[in-house]
Structures are given as structure tokens and as C-alpha cells.
Design a protein with these regions (language model features):
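Short His-Asn-centered micro-motif
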Residues: 47, 152, 184-186, 229
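Extreme N-terminal, non-catalytic leader segments
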Residues: 2-41, 214-223
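Structural motif
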Residues: 44, 148-150, 182, 226
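General beta-strand structural signal in soluble alpha/beta enzymes
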Residues: 108-110, 151, 183
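Conserved P-loop
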Residues: 40-142, 223-272
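Short gly/ser/thr-rich secondary-structure transition/capping motifs
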Residues: 25-28, 130-135, 181-184
Length: 272
């Protein structure tokens, strides 16, 4: 993910005096050169709306692209809390394909169980799995091996009281220079938001004529989704959605094909 807001740069057709007109540049270049971007930020995606984990997957895709196209030292850890192996996700097959093709660029760890539970229903297994995941995260952060560490669904783990918030805040605050950390999930604690360089809240705005229940809405496939607002994570959410669709095409042997059409992105600073 670009951690620096890209800005539009208009360059009109120019003319040389005494000679035929020639095109200097056409269009709008919005991509910030990778050398100008600020790395090492803490990003938090929370809120009731969809797109939090999708945005993290988009960051994964972009970071892998950075390692491929620019041959920079980059490696991603995708650490997923509350998403144990007992449940499959659309993006699983796509991530496995990326791991097979570029094993030096991405590692994935899944912890916990996939079932929904409240703080009162938490078991010793839930606590031990949260601790296992956090121990891996702390080791990864201390090692400085990774350029990006994604802590998917860490916010709900903290909300459930499965980990020490003080320990998490202390560890994330002391991360190595240049290491980007992405934290996702609902109910981000204020003390974590306070130390973040970026906090995007996802809110759902559903069409008024949809009469289906919210649970059924979550299970719908197809349709139109629009990501808008001042916060970052819109394009990365769309990229994450594309990665999920590719995963479905691989695992379910269906004719899934994705078209990624990007406007106002004619520069060379995009790595996805």
C-alpha cells in the first residue's frame, strides 16, 4: 500500500515556438514514485463495514508485486487470528499459489478456530491460540525479516480479552524502522488507534430497496460494491476482492476471471 497520498498532476499539451506542436504529456499521473513513499507505518482498518481483511489482502498483493518488479528486499507475513484451518476462505487457493510461485516473498500463519464466540465463551484453546499467534508476531517484528506484517483480526482478539493490550501496543510502537504493520478487524481499541499513522473505518451503506436480512447479505455473491470516502484502503480492498475471486477460480474450478481496470493510475509506481 502507498503510505503517501498520491496527488493528481495535470500536464497539458505544450507547443514549441516556431515548430509544430508536440505532446509533452497527456492525462493525469497519480502514482507516487516508490522512492518517495513513506514506509514503516502502522495501519488500522476497523469498522462495521466489509473490506478490512480485503484491504490487507490488497496490501499483500502489492507488496509481492514490489518484490517481483523492483527486486527489492521485501517479504510479507500474513498472520490471521480467529481463522484457523477448520474453515476455508476464498483467498486460500490464491495465497497458496503465490506461496508456490514466490516462496521467498510471503509466509502465512493461521491461528484460532473459525467459530464465532463471545468473551464469556472463550476457552483455554482460544487463549492459547491467540498467544501462539502473538508470539509468532512478536518474533517476526523483532527479527526485522519482514517488510510488511499483516495482523488480520487482531482487533477482535483484543476486544475478546485474549491478549494483553499493553503488550501489543508496546510491541507495535517499538517496531523496526521501515516495517509496515497492518491491523484489521472490528473494535480497534483507542490506545492502538492513538499510535497508528493511518486509521480507516469501514462503514456499510446498503441500498434501501434491499429487504434481505444482514446475514443473508453477507452470503450474497455478485452485485455491485462501491468503496468510497476519505480514508485509505479503497483500492486495496478492491485488489483483495480480486484475489478472493482468483482463489475461488482455483479452488472451485469455476470460470472466474478478473478484470482490474484502473483510472487515473498511469504512472509506474503501482506494484500490483
Amino acid at each position: 500500500m502507498e503510505s503517501k497520498q498520491a496527488s493528481g498532476n495535470h500536464e497539458d499539451v505544450s507547443k514549441d515556438k516556431g515548430s509544430a506542436s508536440r505532446t509533452k504529456a497527456i492525462g493525469i499521473v497519480t502514482a507516487a514514485d516508490s522512492r518517495e513513499r513513506r514506509y514503516g507505518q502502522l495501519h488500522i482498518y476497523d469498522g462495521e463495514g466489509k473490506g478490512k481483511s480485503q484491504a490487507a489482502l490488497g496490501v499483500v498483493l502489492r507488496t509481492i508485486g514490489l518484490g517481483i518488479c523492483e527486486k527489492k528486499r521485501t517479504r510479507v507475513l500474513l498472520l490471521r487470528f480467529l481463522k484457523g484451518p477448520g474453515r476455508s476462505y476464498d483467498e486460500d487457493a490464491a495465497i497458496e499459489a503465490l506461496q508456490q510461485g514466490f516462496p521467498h516473498l510471503i509466509d502465512q500463519v493461521r491461528t484460532g478456530r473459525a467459530d464465532f464466540f463471545t468473551a464469556e465463551q472463550a476457552t483455554k484453546f482460544d487463549i492459547s491460540e491467540a498467544k501462539r499467534g502473538w508470539d509468532i508476531a512478536k518474533g517476526a517484528i523483532a527479527s526485522a525479516l519482514y517488510s510488511v506484517v499483516v495482523l488480520d483480526e487482531l482487533n477482535p482478539v483484543l476486544d475478546l480479552g485474549l491478549l494483553s493490550l499493553d503488550d501489543v501496543v508496546k510491541t507495535l510502537r517499538s517496531r523496526p524502522d521501515g516495517m509496515e504493520i497492518i491491523v484489521t478487524g472490528r473494535a480497534a481499541p483507542p490506545s492502538l488507534i492513538k499510535i497508528a499513522e493511518l486509521h480507516s473505518e469501514m462503514r456499510a451503506h446498503r441500498a434501501l430497496d434491499i429487504k434481505d436480512s444482514s446475514q443473508n447479505l453477507l452470503n450474497l455473491s455478485g452485485g455491485i460494491e462501491i468503496y468510497t470516502g476519505e480514508g485509505k484502503g479503497k483500492s486495496t480492498s478492491a485488489l483483495g476482492k480480486a484475489l478472493q475471486a482468483i482463489g475461488r477460480g482455483i479452488s472451485q474450478d469455476k470460470s472466474h476471471r478478473v478484470l482490474i481496470l484502473q483510472w487515473l493510475k498511469g504512472g509506474s509506481g503501482y506494484t500490483e
